Amino acid sequence: MYLTKQIPHYSRIHTTQLLTVVNHRTIPFKIRGSFSNCRRYSNFATVPLLERPFKNKSKHNTARASRPFSTQKMLLTKSHPPNMYKDSVFFGYRPIVFSGKQDQKSKVIQCLRTERKTIPDDLVEDEVDRFYNKLGLDDYYFQMEPVSIIADHIEIIYAAKIAAHASHAKEELNIHVKNENEDLAIYLDSSPVTQPELDQSSAVEESISTRYLDPFKLTDPTAYRVESFTSVTNIDRTSTENSNIYTYFVTKCDFVDNPKKDASPDVPTDIASVSDKTFLEKASDNTIEMYQDVMNSVLTRFGPVVRLFDYQGRSEIRLVVGYRRGSIFQYFPSLSKLFRYYGLHSTRTYVEQFSNGVTIISYNFKPELFKNAAVTSINELFSQITREASLLYCLPSTDFQPLFVSEKLSIQEVTYAHCVRIFCEHVMNKLGPEYSSLSAILDHSNNIHAEILETIKRRLSTLAFTRTKIHDTIMQYPGLVHTLFEQFYLEHAINHNSTPHLHRAKSATSLADEASTYSITPMSATALMDLIQKTCTNEEDVSVMEMFVKFNTHLLKTNFFQTTKVALSFRFDPSFLDSTQYKDPLYAMIMSIGNEFRGFHLRFRDVARGGIRLIKSANPEAFGLNARGLFDENYNLAKTQMLKNKDIPEGGAKGVILLGKDCQDKPELAFMKYIDSIIDLLIVNKSQPLVDKLGKPEILFMGPDENTADLVNWATIHAHRRNAPWWKSFFTGKKPTMGGIPHDKYGMTSLSVRCYVEGIYKKLNITDPSKLTKVQTGGPDGDLGSNEIKLSNEKYIAVIDGSGVLYDPAGLDRTELLRLADERKTIDHFDAGKLSPEGYRVLVKDTNLKLPNGEIVRNGTIFRNTAHLRYKADTFVPCGGRPNAININNVEQLIDDHGRPAFKYLVEGANLFITQDAKSVLEKAGVIVIRDASANKGGVTSSSLEVLASLSFDDASFKENMCVHDGKVPTFYADYVNEVKRIIQRNANLEFEAIWKGHSENKIPYTSLSNHLSTEIVKLDHDIYNYEKLWADVGFRNAVLRASIPKTLQAKIGLEKMLERIPESYLRAIFSTYLASRFVYQHVVSSDPFAFFDYISTEMKMLKDA
């Protein structure tokens, strides 16, 4: 029998509708009541503090590893006397003794008798007495609530009894009440002890978390603290069993010192200056000391802090969890569910907020649960809970939660299942043998064939194993998941000493049994597949469950069992990927999963670099589309980066982060957790070392990409705080004060673009480019766009950017364009008075705008999106715009009826602006087309040399020579930047000459030559890197390194010192890339099998002589 009432506001006089639900029938019952504002707190009567410092007897990271699942529960069935803490010595919070309780009780009786008259007069005293003295409600409740509200709650319980009697209901009486407003909320909830399925306290805690805990970030001035009390007693004298009665109090914090609005790194750490005033008044000295310890730890790490405390002279166990506010959501209710899984109920729970952004939750467990248990067994149980609390911080809830609630799987097992589901969703072979057969028949060099294959691939990937299909299959086989997780645990659990004998999580009856162990038998992949074949009912289910075996078999390391993680990360050997779908083998694959995101990091070489892209979704449909293509997009981006990085030591890599469907407003948090989880796999954690099946250290080199440019400084600082030795080189794109070389400030990407533009002019004997007309996408506000304007001298007739279109056939005013480029402003700031009579500006916000020729522009956005197809000029340099803006469906608009193209020269500065098939069409029409991977490689060259400097300097010298201080640029920094510019121009000219030569001699299309050069360099680079004899020749090796490493760097540090500091893998990459790129640029399309040997012989002689 359920009775529910919600009182919406305290300050309103009204009639409230009471709904009594009996056997699913609704009976209306009127209650008249008035509500008045109540005080947040009043003076508290306190018990003197026993001066005994708290002692942490059992550190959470020293207990033996226990079995990560439980099949039994602890049941709290003993009735607790009401207000049992009032007269005891305390170590947590000073208990409230409400001195006005008796007077208030009399007023409640008077209110019910004379005002309400809903309870028979002769029963009023008995009902009120039972409410005050038998339900175990804390005095805090009576102090916080006014007489009218207490009278309401007593009426609710009485009405429930009447309704139950009228319907002859046999179930136990349950109460569900919530009073909420902006400053205060109080919740009462109950359920029979023996019927946990009726317990709605989880729903209450989810509601509290959603409304009062989760919306507020680290620096928000608003925050709420929570106090919760649990008692066990009979609600009514006629009840046949005890009920758990939960009381929750939520109050708005009144901090001693208001929080700072900016996230300053110098946050205050003294708990007395950042606490809520109520907390300071109520907390004991021991609690303050304890919380200070937890707070200090929270402020020195990114993830949660979990501490276990017990007390001498009193068997109370206290679990304290600290974390940064706003870093996780629904954590409070998730922890409670974890405790209930083990049969634990916290008698008192406190959620405390601090103005420095720290949240601390304290759970108190009473001795009745452990009276027959050995201390080591209790420690083991809570060590287990500690590990799982850290896991819940990463993923408070998953799609497999029903298997946890029904106790078919543990929290670790459902989290494991969730991760494997995501793994399946992205990497399992969904194409089948038919696709492989078709792929073998079609010509991949034919653009039409390649596009057909790609379309079929996307369609099959969507229709085959959907997310729902994979999820439903896993839900059918919890037993298999259980077995597969055991093998995962055996291989990767931390500190189980490689033994298959793991301790079960103890139940109430087995806590005293130290000999209770659980043995896991190791199973081979073949044995697991046999079990899957026998268990699954069809081949599709086998295909899904087989991915668990691949997941386990190819996993090299994971942070799954570390307690300091903030997201889960997995480093795989990617050899399991289907070669039909992924023809070029990856070197490494990392998957990262957090509450707000999922993501991957893929690389094609040991030494590799690429940007980290964060993907947002405008709506659920877009999210589904982005999720389906996530891994393939990551793979293709890394592959493209591999070709673009042909001149530099780092191979191709890329990271992608997909924001969760409901987390589109949390990009920074997702990025931070993604980066931190990857760092877990790269550094050595001495207290909790990973099981490392790779067996060698790894370094990743990253950079900014879509939606992450503003976050790379944080990533660098965070790597430094985590004591990563490679923190200086971890990210490029950082600000100059941190040793970064900004591409936009120095025009690094534009330098290589201009080399190709000017190279074309030089080859065609164009001596005065100012007579050439030019169109540019990507405006003066962007990196490429602004620097292209500054470096060029053609006559601009059109500039198209995010704000709109600027056109003037007489030529745009160059002085005005340079002003916008210097100020990095869009073309909507262009002085329209400087346009000729035929010129115009169309902004995306414009509608029904008339152009000088009489044309009406109905929609400015549509006009902008297609403007690049309207104009004719000598030169077209895309420096921005949407991918595939020119494609096979619209490229014909750039060729007139006589076959004449709109442009003569096209240098693709923006990535992927033109599809490959469209480039082929333009080249056939006579356009000289230079593709993006060749034209814009100046940026990656600059970033690579930034990495090299970071690896070469020690920390002190790096800060002195590579970091700009107070606006003053170090002399070395300025000299190094100038050499970087020269290297960018040298590499661009080498490739341009090779492309021009290959086209002139062999009539091969320019874009095909660009692809050919990149592919050949990458292949030869790989072979040289792995050819030991060349590397073993120390004299030749050092000569190559001396020729390839910037002279400015060598002069400052010395080659010998650099060779000591730079990892050997990176030095080998410098060596192999230098030789491979120069050979291919010289020989272009040579088929002479001895050409490379002749080249090496010549290089050896020349370099050694030098």
UniProtKB/Swiss-Prot annotation:
Enzyme Commission designation: 1.4.1.2
UniProt superkingdom: Eukaryota
One Gene Ontology biological process: glutamate catabolic process
Keyword set, alphabetical order: Cytoplasm, NAD, Oxidoreductase
Entries under SUPFAM superfamilies matching the protein: Aminoacid dehydrogenase-like, N-terminal domain, NAD(P)-binding Rossmann-fold domains
Active site per UniProt: K654
Pfam families: ELFV_dehydrog, GDH2_N, GDH_2nd
Subunit field text: Homotetramer.
Protein task: NAD(+)-dependent glutamate dehydrogenase which degrades glutamate to ammonia and alpha-ketoglutarate.
PANTHER family: GLUTAMATE DEHYDROGENASE (PTHR11606), NAD-SPECIFIC GLUTAMATE DEHYDROGENASE (PTHR11606:SF24)
Similarity comment text for this entry: Belongs to the Glu/Leu/Phe/Val dehydrogenases family.
Annotated protein name in UniProt: Probable NAD-specific glutamate dehydrogenase
Protein species of origin: Schizosaccharomyces pombe (strain 972 / ATCC 24843) (Fission yeast)
Gene: gdh2
